[in-house]
Amino acid sequence: MSLQQKIKAYLKLGKLGVVSLLDLAAIAGAFLAYKHGISLLPIIPMLIGGTLASMGAMIINSGIEINRDKVMSRTSNRPTVVGYVSRKEVIVVGSLLAVLGTALGFIDNALTAFFIALGVIIYVFVYTILLKPRTWLNIVIGGFAGSAAAWAGYTSLTNSLTLEAFLLGFLIFMWTPGHFWSLALKYREDYINAHYPMLPAVVGITTSARAIATSNALMIPIVLLMGYYISLIALIVFSVLSALLLFLSYRLILNPTKEEAMKSFIFSNIYLMLILLSIIIIKLI
């Protein structure tokens, strides 16, 4: 296997799509803390470190879950499953990236490094190893990994946490279950075959649709409070986006199908992305 193919395999295992959203959360966290006159240079080591650590966590995850990935259609073509890279190799490489990423956080401060490491620990040990194979609450508690990214961004500029930082982290935590349950509903049979107790594999499609809608609805007050805290413009933007999310959630309840679940999943990605981008843009104005 050539070096180029090896790099391509690791980029796939590193889940750049997921990592890019975590990076956006970290950048939004940093800009939430930004005040005119403060240097933005600390964002650079935090972002590089967070990216490497997040990719490392994803890569370790692929090594741990290789046997279950083999029976899931969505993951059956991963480089670990088809034999491009071994379990031992990915765990070593992933661990090195996680350690290097955490070390880069120390360039800013110890608190930033702590939150980078916390994201890895929650995703690998709490979510992947402890909770995912055992309880449908896996993704609920695992959502704190995304919160850690936002907090790492915030502390890179402040070396402290405030109410607004906690709100952003809690927003991401509340967003996570509805988002991933939508994907799990689409691939429900995969999770059943792999014996993962993801909520849609445990309670069925109709109940899952209601749980997704309920989770999204419970998140909205946090989003609106966040918008109110930032500015009137943010509150208006967040309200419009939240109305669209609630509309799609209502449609999913009325028509609990995999197609509607996928629409909910795609829009929830867009929803969080626009929320985070709005924070960055508004704080720059």
From Swiss-Prot:
Keyword Cell membrane: yes
One Gene Ontology term of the molecular function aspect: protoheme IX farnesyltransferase activity
Catalytic activity annotation: heme b + (2E,6E)-farnesyl diphosphate + H2O = Fe(II)-heme o + diphosphate
Spans through the membrane: 13-33, 40-60, 90-110, 111-131, 137-157, 165-185, 198-220, 230-252, 265-285
Single Gene Ontology BP annotation: heme biosynthetic process
Pathway listed: Porphyrin-containing compound metabolism; heme O biosynthesis; heme O from protoheme: step 1/1
Compartment list: Cell membrane
Coiled-coil features, chain-numbered ranges: none
Entry keyword set: Cell membrane, Heme biosynthesis, Membrane, Transferase, Transmembrane, Transmembrane helix
Enzyme Commission code: 2.5.1.141
Superkingdom of the organism of origin: Archaea
Record membrane topology: Multi-pass membrane protein
GO cellular component, one term: plasma membrane
Known function: Converts heme B (protoheme IX) to heme O by substitution of the vinyl group on carbon 2 of heme B porphyrin ring with a hydroxyethyl farnesyl side group.
Something else known: Carbon 2 of the heme B porphyrin ring is defined according to the Fischer nomenclature.
Family that this chain belongs to: Belongs to the UbiA prenyltransferase family. Protoheme IX farnesyltransferase subfamily.
Name assigned to this protein: Protoheme IX farnesyltransferase
Species of provenance: Saccharolobus solfataricus (strain ATCC 35092 / DSM 1617 / JCM 11322 / P2) (Sulfolobus solfataricus)
